[in-house]
Amino acid sequence: MRRGRNSLLDGRMVSAPPDRIAFDRGVLTRVREADVADFIGAAAANAERLREWIPWGDDPAYRRERIGGAPVDWEQHRAYLYALRESDDGAVIGGFSLHRRVGPDGLEIGYWLDAAHTGAGLATEAVGVLTAVALALPEVERVEIHTDEGNTRSAAVPRRLGYRLARVDAFEVRTGSETGRLQIWVTP
């Protein structure tokens, strides 16, 4: 695992996570320009399922904008998008990300997994590894995961990893399955 580099963001020094993170059942690799089409294809193949919980899940233009902007977001230290693959040259089977939108000392993890790979603990394993990587960055004191109260499968991931439910906030519903109650899970 190669350490990321340091940069200034909003007048403070921040560290980028590594471009590649290998673990027992997969590898998380930074989404670069060359990866965008494969990532979009994997997300599109899961659009029907993702649209229940992710606003860009069923909107091809929004999906292209969000995923297509990932390389720039990484360079500007706004967010770090990873493709999950079973091997370095394997197909994209999920998306995992770190976002700098929860305050200067925290990162938020987001994730989705291809339907054929759910139910076997792979998301939990990948999020666990990504949590450790995030907490190893010198400026990061906490990691958050935000899940809709109705998305029990997604909420099971932070629960299994020992995150604590810090609060439940109201939010504007953007998809058909959302409840408008956002669970904020925080590392202990």
Positions of PLM-derived features:
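Acyl-donor (CoA/ACP) binding surface of acyl/acetyltransferases
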Residues: M1-D38, A42-E52, L81-P188
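A generic alpha-helix structural signal
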Residues: I40-A43, I67-P71
